[in-house]
Amino acid sequence: MQTVLTSLLRSEFLRSGLALAKGAWKKGITLALVALLATSCSGVFLAETESNPWEVIALPTEAAISDVAFASDGEHGWLVGSRTTLLESTDAGKTWDPRILELGEQNYTFTSIDFSGDEGWLVGQPNIMLHTTDGGTSWSNIPLDPQLPGQPLLVTATGKNSAEMATDIGAIYTTKDGGQKWKGLVQSAVGVVRNMSRNEEGRYVAVSSRGNFYSTWLPGQEAWQPHNRENSKRLQNMGFTKEGLLWLIARGGQMQFGTEQTEYEEWSEPINPEFAASWGLLDVAYRTPEELWVTGGSGNLLMSTDGGETWMKDKAVEDVPTNFYRIKFLGQDRGYILGQRGYLLRYEEAHSNLV
């Protein structure tokens, strides 16, 4: 009897010990998972910027805004977009009013505007180019060849009576006489592009319509140079850093930075600034050589002060009900983020503690 009782007690003791050990094991696993989650989240959810330098402005239109530019005084500015939208500001972009031009019954999508002093150029689709020499008080229509390869996508004011215009298939033209005559700079087009960027040195980069490849063009080259994308992810957008290197955004919010500016085919390792927002990164702009801002869908706005090594998030604008699909700095103290449904963000340096 004692032997049986001893055996029962021993079995119960073992079961209790196993239960305690199992409970301790589960607790240990739980604590480990909590620690892992906390560590992981530090790389998923970014720290907030110390201040919000962006003022939200409601525009008197729900048209899609494509571009922004200012005349020489920095007070007289213009926004252009779909539905023949032309908005004018005379107070450095704080308020905007519609400007109606007599362009007939055709509805245009204005795609690009740029100024050199008070001389400005505006292009759009279907083929249209407007020119001003008085800051936009008056605009004249510059006739374009009906056989123009593609439709105007990008225009850059390059000096007195001078401009460069690029079409949506990569044809590039220049004028030195106010638009009366145009000279082609490339012998062949690159194909339909989803976006195109030009830096101050006159270099271009364009992403193919499906994001399968990108092309570059340098002044003096007879044709665009095609480049395969770095990996399997399709390209979303590309542009230039302050140093003339390339940056790219791929689908899924992946970013890379170019490491040389000769062949434009060497890249840093891919990064995802914030996994939680990685699905919607759309554009990049540099305020300084080291400070860059990245815009995205659903009010996502990220910022780095060290060239993309570390990142912060401007959470003050994440509830703005729009996609931030373009960002543009016109100087260190002037910047704009173009949204949808009539939303515009204006950079106010006075509101910023960022260096």
What is the role of each PLM region?
Residues G28-T39:
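Bacterial N-terminal signal peptides
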Residues V4-I29:
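Bacterial N-terminal signal peptides that target proteins for export
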Residues T39-V355:
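Residue-level hotspots at or immediately adjacent to binding/recognition sites across diverse folds
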